[in-house]
Amino acid sequence: MFANTTRRSVLAALAGAALAPFPGKAVRKATAFALVGDRYHNSDYVRIGLTRTITKELGVTIDFTDETSLLNAETLDGYKALIILRDGMLWPDGYGGDESSNAAWVATGRPKLVSDPPLPQVRARSEYWMKPEQGKAVRQFVEASGAALFLHNTTNVSLADPDFRHVLGGAYTGHPPIRTFKVKVTNPDHPITQGVRDFVVTDEQHYMNYDKDPKFLFLQTVNEDGLTYQSYGATAPGGWSYDYGKGRVCYMSPGHMLTDLWNPEYIKLQHNAVRWIMRQNV
């Protein structure tokens, strides 16, 4: 049904108005637009992970980008699905000398950072990237029959915009350090959980305030060692889905590492979720 190709960021062309009067329509689009990657989540593993589970195994093509400004009504026009795996923050002044999100630096023992001449001293600060018009664009896209798959830390984006939060259905409250926990199926009758068993991952166990009806929940994350996070206990919502206007929404919380995205049971969930939000047979 769909071509079996992906482009990492053919969307970069969309940013250049010189290419066409309407850059959002300048190139032939894939089935899904994916905004992925942030300071703490390398876009490469997300692209590799979802290219396998969604494009190669389902035949659903994806245009990937990490450019947040491309999430807008003009870009979304013509896509059938939206996928997001990233947080809501940008760091315009850098990281203030903290390179702990750089895996190679950490793996080599965090050597002293030396620069000659010295780097300018700039204080690190984060800011939300989502603008009101972007949240509105996402809401209108899904209401008009678009499919939305939100993964892992996307709940953090909800903190910046009420329209986006209304679509996603919850907002991030935090997570403990990476640890092992179980993902439990709480609604075995849901189309997305068909053929899926409980499974275990080593991941960030994300906690959030869930805004919608409990009947839409189909996954729960559980730390079976009894480890908690702040006052939130050892369990958290792990996945939910619902119709939204003429479209559909699904959120699932695992996804901090490639090993999580490629857990065999989680692959089943991704397959079922994409089919469900796009109204294909599950």
What are the functions of these language-model segments?
Residues S43, N72, Y128-K131, G233:
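A conditional alpha-helix N-cap/helix-loop micro-motif detector
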Residues T31-V36, L76-S158, K246:
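Short alpha-beta junction capping motif
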Residues F2-A3, S9-A26:
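N-terminal export signals
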Residues V27-R28, T55, A160-R248, S253:
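Catalytic beta-strand/loop cores that center a nucleophilic Ser/Cys/Thr
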Residues K29-A30, K56, V60, E67, ...:
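Extracellular ligand-binding/catalytic regions of CAZymes and related secreted enzymes
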Residues D38-H41, S69-L70, G88-W91, T154-S158, ...:
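Solvent-exposed loop/turn segments at secondary-structure junctions
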Residues K25-A81, L85-G88, A104-W105:
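Aromatic-Pro/Gly-enriched surface loop or interdomain linker
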